């Protein structure tokens, strides 16, 4: 029967007058994943209608696999390219693209730099995105206002926290993530499960802050949420309840309980409304109940009038979906959508197109932020510098004052090969920090903070002082203790050789981090590549003896190690003389040693070898740029693969199976299924 009014005779209140702000409406919104292999097309969202308005906060709820994230991504314009969306998505009555500056999106994971304080995190983000025409005082005023708006005053000067330093709480981290997104004063704010992993108190404060943002700032706030507490649920103005991509209920959250009661599924007095809603539409409860019955051999309970005990969850869900389609709530939503579709103009809505900061301001800000992060993160460079110092003294004492005897030839070669090969290999230790930095980059890049070129340049500039320190410390200790060829110019070349070799390894690991964003697999991949480079450097097997096909040409020419070792040999041996193997024979020149014994060509200078390393460094940085750009284009294909895996997994879930039609309810109405809780929600029938 069609629902024309609520049980007490009241209808949902008439929609508010249309004023300033962003009015978002969607009509007959459908999202499908086409199966190009010939199988059936998967329908993720099925003909959804709804709207979100300024000054109100909407909750998108539903069981796992119901389409919450898909709906949120559809509204935010973040759908993968492998899916097809149909229907109308209107912004103030117009079909418009939801660009950066108009909308903001807060991800479920809080990706922040743990070494920065809350105030620093927000300040750097403000300088990256706000207009360069603003003075420093004006930017600081915006930052302080945002801190106050999110209630972060008490933790503003505490670090976010990472693996070696304790920081702010989970709720405070989430509010920091929200603060970063509202800096540009977006008109619409989307949030993906902002209370995930938070306790009830922290979740309440987060949603309360979002409600204040919506009401005080006149913004439109839409948030997906899984299973909020009753206190949190009461903070939401509107509710969009989904199940298997279909609308179970859309309207004001305070009328949802009445809707379920009218449909024959009243919420018990002592039960959280959100728990009751999900209990009615989540078919996984049937599986759990059946499993418990089978394992514990529970007897059949007596007949009861409780519909949750007499009906399968899929049947309850089908009835709710059908009742909503025929209800006054659905009619009210469609009527409001028609009103919003008639809006003309933007109604005072300010729209920003991309970041308003200049390229050079972004470069300066990113460089400073990255440098501060490197200084405070002991695992980024400081731990490696300590290890470099220790290893340098070990090398210096083992090869101390190596001399010019015949046996010193092998010692010099071994020492030079170890320094240019194994000591530069230690730069792989910064990979975990690379991974964390890349996460921040991907998140900020997706939100339109800055471009790829700015990030790559700022990363190298900020690391430059640390790389110089590593080269100078290692070069000074080993060069003077081993007593390589004397002379300031030779010492300078030795340090430059180390500097550019370490820079190449750093750049290589950045490429690996962009391709393999997993800590363990990235380390294995990077170590394997560096191992190949070392094998073709000419240290383990002389360059002339390498197989000509592939290993000599082109691998050894692409290996920084071969150029680094050749340059190191020339820098140390040329100009020196060594004692002969047998007494009475003439002394051996350094040129003879490296050319005849070690197969190093002396037709070009050591500076050419150093230039080759610099060229390889530039190539790695360019490759890093290309990989990041290509990943942006290839990401839809990767998401398509992930989507197929997700669909296969969801097909096995009872909650994802297609619900039966309403006409089929009578035939299976009295099956002896049992709910997990009684009507009062305090005890369980399973004893």
From Swiss-Prot:
Phosphoserine modifications at: 661, 667
Protein keywords: ATP-binding, Cell membrane, Endoplasmic reticulum, Lipid transport, Membrane, Nucleotide-binding, Phosphoprotein, Plant defense, Transmembrane, Transmembrane helix, Transport
Domain named ABC transporter: residues: 24-269
Comp. bias regions, Polar residues: 674-687
TM ranges: 385-405, 415-435, 454-474, 492-512, 515-535, 549-568, 608-628
InterPro entries for the chain: AAA+_ATPase, ABC2_TM, ABC_transporter-like_ATP-bd, ABC_transporter-like_CS, ABCG_dom, P-loop_NTPase, Plant_ABCG
SS bond partners: none
Region annotated Disordered, chain positions: 649-687
Induction summary: By NaCl and abscisic acid (ABA).
GO cellular component: endoplasmic reticulum; plasma membrane
Tissue expression from the record: Exclusively and constitutively expressed in epidermal cells.
UniProt-annotated binding residues for ATP: 62-69
Protein's cellular compartments: Cell membrane; Endoplasmic reticulum
GO biological process terms, semicolon-separated: defense response to virus; export from cell; lipid transport; response to abscisic acid; response to salt stress; transmembrane transport; wax biosynthetic process
Membrane topology: Multi-pass membrane protein
GO molecular function list: ABC-type transporter activity; ATP binding; ATP hydrolysis activity; efflux transmembrane transporter activity
Gene3D superfamilies per UniProt: P-loop containing nucleotide triphosphate hydrolases
Residues in ABC transmembrane type-2 domain copies: 361-573
Mutant phenotype after disruption: Abnormal cuticle and unusual lipidic cytoplasmic inclusions in epidermal cells associated with a reduced secretion of aldehydes, alcohols and acids. The double mutant abcg11 abcg12 exhibits ABCG12-containing membrane inclusions protruded into the vacuole and contiguous with the endoplasmic reticulum. Reduced polarizing on the adaxial and abaxial leaves surfaces, and impaired impact of viral infection by Turnip vein clearing virus (TVCV) on the polarization of reflected light leading to high light reflections; this phenotype is not visible upon viral infection by Cucumber mosaic virus (CMV).
One Pfam family this sequence matches: ABC_tran
Subunit structure: Forms heterodimers with ABCG11 in epidermal cells.
UniProt record similarity statement: Belongs to the ABC transporter superfamily. ABCG family. Eye pigment precursor importer (TC 3.A.1.204) subfamily.
Biological role: Involved in the secretion of cuticular wax from epidermal cells to the cuticle, especially in the transport of aldehydes, alcohols and acids.
Protein's name according to its UniProt entry: ABC transporter G family member 12
Organism: Arabidopsis thaliana (Mouse-ear cress)
């Amino acid at each position: 029967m069609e629902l024309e009014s609520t049980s007490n005779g009241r209808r949902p209140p008439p929609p508010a007058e249309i004023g300033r702000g962003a009015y978002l409406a969607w009509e007959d919104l459908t999202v499908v994943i086409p199966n190009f292999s010939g199988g059936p097309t998967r329908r993720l969202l099925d003909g959804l209608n709804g709207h979100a308005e300024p000054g109100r906060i909407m909750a998108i709820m539903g069981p796992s696999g119901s389409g919450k994230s898909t709906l949120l991504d559809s509204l935010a314009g973040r759908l993968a390219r492998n899916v097809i969306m149909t229907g109308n998505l209107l912004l103030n009555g117009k079909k418009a693209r939801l660009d950066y500056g108009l909308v903001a999106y807060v991800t479920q994971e809080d990706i922040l730099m743990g070494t920065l304080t809350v105030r620093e995190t927000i300040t750097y983000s403000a300088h990256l995105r706000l207009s360069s025409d603003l003075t420093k005082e004006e930017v600081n005023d915006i930052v302080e206002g945002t801190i106050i708006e999110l209630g972060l005053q008490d933790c503003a000067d505490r670090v976010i926290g990472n693996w070696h330093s304790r920081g702010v709480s989970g709720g405070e981290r989430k509010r920091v993530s929200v603060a970063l997104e509202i800096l540009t004063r977006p008109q619409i704010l989307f949030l993906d499960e902002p209370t995930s992993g938070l306790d009830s108190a922290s979740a309440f404060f987060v949603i309360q802050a979002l409600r204040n943002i919506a009401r005080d700032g006149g913004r439109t706030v839409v948030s997906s949420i899984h299973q909020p507490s009753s206190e949190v649920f009461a903070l939401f103005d509107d509710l969009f309840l989904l199940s298997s991509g279909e609308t179970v209920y859309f309207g004001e959250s305070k009328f949802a309980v009445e809707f379920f009661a009218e449909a024959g599924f009243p919420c018990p007095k002592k039960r959280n409304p959100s728990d009751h809603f999900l209990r009615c539409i989540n078919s996984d409860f049937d599986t759990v109940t059946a499993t418990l019955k089978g394992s514990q051999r529970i007897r059949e309970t007596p007949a009861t009038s409780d519909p949750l005990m007499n009906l399968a969850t899929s049947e309850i869900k089908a009835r709710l979906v059908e009742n909503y389609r025929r209800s006054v709530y659905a009619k009210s939503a469609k009527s409001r959508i028609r009103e919003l579709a008639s809006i003309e103009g933007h109604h005072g809505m300010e729209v920003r197109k991309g970041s308003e900061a200049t390229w050079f301001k972004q470069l300066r800000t990113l460089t400073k932020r990255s440098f501060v992060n490197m200084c405070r993160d002991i695992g980024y460079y400081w731990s490696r510098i300590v290890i470099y110092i220790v290893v340098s003294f070990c090398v210096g004492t083992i090869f101390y004052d190596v001399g010019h005897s015949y046996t010193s030839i092998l010692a010099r070669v071994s020492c030079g090969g170890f320094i240019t090969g194994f000591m530069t290999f230690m730069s792989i230790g910064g990979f975990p920090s690379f991974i964390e930095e890349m996460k921040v980059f991907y998140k900020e890049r997706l939100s339109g903070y800055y471009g790829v070129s700015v990030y790559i340049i700022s990363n190298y500039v900020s690391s430059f002082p640390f790389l110089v320190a590593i080269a100078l410390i290692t070069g000074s200790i080993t060069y003077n203790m081993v007593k390589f060829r004397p002379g300031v110019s030779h010492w300078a070349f030795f340090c430059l050789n180390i500097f550019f070799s370490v820079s190449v390894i750093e750049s290589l690991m950045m490429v690996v981090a962009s391709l393999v964003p997993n800590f363990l697999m990235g380390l294995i991949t990077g170590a394997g590549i560096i191992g190949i480079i070392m094998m073709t450097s000419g240290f383990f097997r002389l360059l002339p003896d390498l197989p000509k096909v592939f290993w000599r040409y082109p691998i050894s020419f692409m290996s920084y190690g071969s150029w680094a070792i050749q340059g190191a040999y020339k820098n140390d041996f040329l100009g020196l003389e060594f004692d002969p193997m047998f007494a009475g024979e003439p002394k051996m020149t350094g040129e003879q040693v490296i050319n005849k014994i070690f197969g190093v060509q002396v037709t070009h200078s050591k500076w050419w070898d150093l230039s080759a390393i610099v060229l390889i460094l530039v190539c790695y940085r360019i490759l890093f740029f290309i990989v990041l750009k290509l990943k942006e284009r290839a990401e839809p294909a990767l998401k398509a693969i992930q989507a197929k895996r997700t669909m296969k997994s969801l097909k096995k879930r009872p909650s994802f199976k297609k619900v039966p039609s309403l006409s089929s309810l009578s035939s299976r109405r009295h099956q002896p299924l049992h709910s997990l809780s009684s009507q009062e929600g305090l005890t369980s029938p399973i004893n």
